[in-house]
């Protein structure tokens, strides 16, 4: 692990002894999940998917048992792992926690971004964006910042198609986005 040049020390935890081990927040706590395979060069798709699922299941168990409230996943072949059961990892994780309303958040202290839709081809995005979806996502993000980070967020909803007003008299931003922002402001959410 020295090759990664982490500033914190690493600690390997025994998966079977987790309830007897104390989590040290000053270290990076790792759990090695064995990949059972006799042929190291070629992993069959089913074995890869099974391994990824075991890793996720352990992570979900650790979250549910209160060992952590964070999850970082590395790159995986979502198409093969999810096998058309979910649009993406966000939806997969939501299903494992029985959550119907979720938001994907790319978080940074200065600027965070949350797309209204996830894992959709661009041609389907405009059909999915509704006033209800905008309200749902803004409330999810607002609640996250207030309850988890104890911050009062300033939320900006960017236009769905900002240059459309110059063509005909149809403008999705006026019809969908702007009217929902006004509704959210009435609910005391700092959104523009």
Task: Briefly describe each language-model feature range.
Residues 1-192:
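Anion-binding alpha/beta catalytic cores of soluble intermediary-metabolism enzymes, centered on
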